[in-house]
Amino acid sequence: MKVDELRKAFLNFFEAREHRVIPSASLVPHGDPTLLFTTAGMVQFKPYFMGLETPPASRLTSIQRCFRTTDVEEVGDENHLTLFEMLGNFSVGDYFKSESIDWAWEFLTEVLGINKDRLWATVYIDDDEAYDLWKKKGISEDRILRYTAEQGNYWGPPGDSGPCGPCSELHYDFGTPVIEDENYNPDKDHPAMDTGRFLEIWNLVFMAYYQHEDGTREDLPAANIDTGAGLERLAAVLQGVRSAYETDELRSILKSAEEVTEIAYTPELADQNANGLRVITEHARAFAYLAADGVLPSNEGRGYVLRRLIRRACLLYTSDAADE
């Protein structure tokens, strides 16, 4: 399935389940001083979750362009991205855990046809309800893991304060790790070990709390659902590749980078050239979207981040060219 076909399938699925389709918001958050960039699909919906504004519908769905600065230095490997698209379905006081788990499972296994035996679920350490719901879907107990917040199963807030809640993640099992380790034991491997065997593809956040800057929490006006599935990651699974850069849309940009630099992409060698071409590909795409949303290079704030991307891509390009 091509990336654009995946976009259409997702929106059609949730629109058929009475979700209002909402366009992607700008990468520059509107009226939210706590964030430099739009980092998640729920950002434009924060006022609805907090009870500050009335949503156009209680069920919403979107494909949101997101930008995260935390991964800038990691870009260059097979999967890290600063700019990505987040498939999301949201409930503002409407449905909760049962429906969100039902629909995530249905979309992945029935619409996309992903092998059920390849899916693992993680739940927050004390979330018995989510655990039981995944078990009813047929996931064996050894593939339903209880994780702490430190292991990634508590989401938010997106910024110094805001909505948050425990979450449940779905991971795809490729069957083999990426790392080479003679002591590797597949029976002890699990998603939190970061061996490359597992890829997180969907995060379901049970958003029922508001966290203040001092870390204290209180109940939101209603229990909400905020889910996010990485478009590029899902596309990699569906297209049978391990790298986001091998998916059809990113690969087309990477081919252009090969032509401009006159450097061949050889990921099997895991060399500096492959790393550099991935950086150029990713940062060029991020630059295009940021600039389209009004971000220009400068010495501070958002503009400084953009300038940093340009500098990093140029440095790697000149370094790679010198090696040729």
Give residue spans per PLM region.
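Conserved small/polar residues in nucleotide/adenosyl-binding loops
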Residues: Y317-D323
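Alpha-helical segments
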Residues: M1-L306, R311-L316
